Amino acid sequence: MGNKINPNGFRLGITRGWNSRWYAGKKQYAGLLKEDEKIRKLVDKKLSAAGIARVEIERAGQQVNVIISAAKPGIVIGKGGDSIKQLRADIEKLVSAGTVAVNVAEIPNPNISAPLVALRIAEQIERRFAFRRAMKQAAQRVMESGARGVKVVLSGRLGGAEQARRETVREGRVPLHTLRADIDYGTALARTTYGILGIKVMVFTGEVIGGRTETIARPQRRNDERRPEGGDRANRRRPTARRRAGGE
């Protein structure tokens, strides 16, 4: 179950919130849902260089609030705010009614943001990097940035092989069934000459206890507690020939 379900949907309402927050009747619901999808596609297309991790949409009456979480907020805002003004004008054309407000939130640590890690791997593969090297480097970068665990899954015609397969790189601990685990999940597509590769990334940063994420310290052994090479068998003495003879 934990391997198949979307980690964000599995923890929705527990450690994860909704990306679209609004209420609508049965007749308006489908139309507003399509508008949200168009807004997200527009943001991803126009601001692909800004490192967009998440687009949240809030609706209250005739007000539409779009919150963009980006690794490079300066690209979203633009020089003198020109880019964000143009983006707001484009979004207003997609919205049926109401005024639009666009807010930008900076991601403090992009290296542990799963959507951004997946996008970085996809860009490297599209530039003909070795896929194993890209996966391992991304996992190491995530662990060095303070994450407790990371899992990267790459599927498709890896290396141009005739038969599609899947490869996984895992570092640290990534709990799949612990609902209080703070797991960030992101996907991306790498379009290559031999087909499309799918990338999934899960980043575990700690457990949410009392409304805040608490990191779990890794168990460490002291120097005097470390076992010698060979385990307990190295400390066992073999009986000498004289002792064996005396025992007989």
From Swiss-Prot:
GO annotation terms (biological process): translation
GO cellular component: cytosolic small ribosomal subunit
InterPro entries linked to this entry: KH_dom, KH_dom-like_a/b, KH_dom_type_2, KH_sf_prok-type, Ribosomal_S3_C_sf, Ribosomal_uS3_bac-typ, Ribosomal_uS3_C, Ribosomal_uS3_CS
UniProt superkingdom: Bacteria
Keyword rRNA-binding listed: yes
One MF annotation (Gene Ontology) recorded for this entry: rRNA binding
Domain KH type-2: 39-108
Region (Disordered): 214-248
Pfam family membership, one: Ribosomal_S3_C
Zinc found in the keyword field: no
Family of the protein in this entry: Belongs to the universal ribosomal protein uS3 family.
Protein task: Binds the lower part of the 30S subunit head. Binds mRNA in the 70S ribosome, positioning it for translation.
Subunit annotation: Part of the 30S ribosomal subunit. Forms a tight complex with proteins S10 and S14.
Protein name: Small ribosomal subunit protein uS3
